[in-house]
Amino acid sequence: MEQEFVALGHAGSDAYAGLETFPNPGVSVVELRSDELTAVCPITNQPDFYVATIEYRPKELCLESKSLKIYLSRFRDQGAFCEALAVQIRDEVTAALELAHEDVDVTLIQKARGGITITASV
């Protein structure tokens, strides 16, 4: 039976149905990286730009990348500190993949603002 994806093949966040997964074809480590993650500072409401790296050691499931792209775009207008955002992403990816926290690593690098770059890893 062919698996159907909600996000794949659809434009924009209207197709967002959560983080979608597919059966692990046998890989032991997956790394996904995006430089399209944005959020806003919860204090100043100024935009923050991130490079996000998600590395996980799959068991039964892998993340479908288009659903991840749409998932990350949902943070665009949300206020969040870098550190809290890293934890939230790790927790939601962990839940979608049905893994333990130690099987998922998330690193966010917040691009410099005011001369300071922040890196948060969980």
Named regions from a protein language model:
Residues 1-122:
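N-terminal intrinsically disordered, cationic/polar leader segments
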